Amino acid sequence: MLSVETHAAAPWPDALDWAARAAEAVAAAFAITPFAALADAAPLVEVAVRLTDDAEVHTLNRDFRGRDKPTNVLSFPQVQNDLLESLANSDDGEILLGDIVLARETCAREADEKGVSLAAHATHLIVHGALHLVGYDHMDDVSAAAMEALEVKALASLGIANPYADQD
């Protein structure tokens, strides 16, 4: 069973149910991967989503990635890629798959630049982060294209337009 725990540490707009949005985004991301069974697996599979500010993400990005600046989203997988396939068959009671952390100011700025709502952009970033938790990456053009295609498919299932449509 999939559990998404969301914690808002910074002033994210209250008009949206961020916990429900995060849960939908993570579930949509997993549903279009070979790891869809994790959502209904016997062990509790938990993903933590933290909505925070640029200052906290800057610190995390510096400390864990060696990049001394904020970024829009960070993912911290807790399960090695080679163990992911066996999780659905695990008899462990609970598995922490990992953490996704979003920076409000960066997300809001990027949403404005793209002409989309903060909710749509944050949902995209949560989908992106969830895909990282199950082993997807964008270190080269081929893996980036594959990951973007999955993001587009997951977002479409949530009624969100292709965020890459205007890119050449």
UniProtKB/Swiss-Prot annotation:
Predominant localisation class = cytoplasm
Signal peptide as annotated in the record: none
- For this protein, the Enzyme Commission number is 3.1.-.-
Matching Gene3D superfamilies, A to Z?
A: Metalloproteases ('zincins'), catalytic domain
Q: What does the cofactor section's free text say about binding?
A: Binds 1 zinc ion.
Question: Pfam families, alphabetically?
Answer: YbeY
Which GO MF terms are attached to this record?
metalloendopeptidase activity; RNA endonuclease activity; zinc ion binding
Q: Name one GO biological process term.
A: rRNA processing
Q: Name the cofactor(s) required for activity, per the record.
A: Zn(2+)
Q: Which GO terms describe its cellular component?
A: cytoplasm
* Sequence similarity: Belongs to the endoribonuclease YbeY family.
Q: Which NCBIfam families match?
A: rRNA maturation RNase YbeY (TIGR00043)
User: What is the protein name given in its UniProt record?
Assistant: Endoribonuclease YbeY
Gene of this entry: ybeY
